[in-house]
């Protein structure tokens, strides 16, 4: 039962992870129009700003997550606070630099999720159930990506791209508190 509950919580966290990661793609056009960004700036904001920090921080965070005394749940909660807060900050960005810095923050925060989650799953799931457990957790990728596109598009059409970032980011802060409990 503990493993099942943990997997459901981790799945929800991973859905938020990919929702916040992918929402920027559907919002690129209205952001570009509103802030007068070039295609190069959009590419930097949607790609390298996130990916470089996510990639380079993933390995050291994974090493930290694997330490025996690391509080993996706490690491996931802090990561969720960082990426959700930074996603919400994207919604109040007034220029390219602010948006770029917020997207870097999303990458930094999200870098801590998967290593800690995989380490936690490895601790809780017996070897014969680990592959299934990680597969269940990984369902967050397509579900979160889909929700990011759908929610992002619907909210942006109705209320603007800024509201889409706020609606995507702010609930993650509440989720982080629940995860930590």
Task: Pin down the residues of each PLM region.
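Helix-breaking motifs and short loop linkers at transmembrane-helix boundaries and internal kinks
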Residues: 36, 69-70, 92-98, 109, ...
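Cytoplasmic helix-loop-helix junction between adjacent transmembrane helices
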Residues: 102-142
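Conserved MFS/SLC helix-loop-helix module at the cytosolic interface between two early adjacent transmembrane helices
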Residues: 56-97
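Membrane-interface helix termini in secondary transporters
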Residues: 30, 59-63, 154
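Extracellular/periplasmic helix-loop-helix junction of adjacent transmembrane segments
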Residues: 27-56
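Cytosolic juxtamembrane N-terminal segment immediately preceding the first transmembrane helix
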Residues: 1-19
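Residue-level signature of mid-helix packing/kink "hotspots" within the transmembrane helices
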Residues: 22, 50-59, 111, 145-146
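Helix-loop-helix hairpin linking two adjacent transmembrane segments in secondary transporters
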Residues: 137-181
């Amino acid at each position: 039962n503990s493993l099942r509950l943990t997997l459901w919580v981790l799945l929800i966290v991973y859905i938020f992870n990919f929702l916040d990661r992918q929402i920027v793609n559907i919002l690129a056009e209205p952001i570009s129009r509103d802030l007068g960004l070039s295609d190069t700036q959009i590419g930097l904001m949607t790609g390298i700003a996130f990916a470089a920090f996510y990639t380079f921080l993933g390995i050291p965070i994974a090493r930290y997550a694997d330490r025996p005394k690391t509080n993996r749940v706490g690491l996931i909660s802090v990561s969720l606070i960082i990426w959700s807060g930074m996603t919400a900050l994207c919604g109040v960005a007034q220029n390219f630099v602010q948006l770029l810095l917020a997207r870097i923050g999303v990458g930094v925060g999200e870098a801590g999720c998967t290593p800690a989650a995989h380490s936690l799953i490895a601790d809780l799931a017996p070897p014969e159930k680990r592959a299934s457990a990680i597969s269940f957790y990984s369902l967050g990728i397509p579900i979160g990506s889909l929700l990011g596109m759908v929610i992002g598009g619907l909210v942006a059409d109705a209320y603007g791209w800024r509201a889409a970032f706020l609606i995507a980011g702010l609930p993650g802060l509440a989720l982080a508190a629940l995860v930590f409990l």
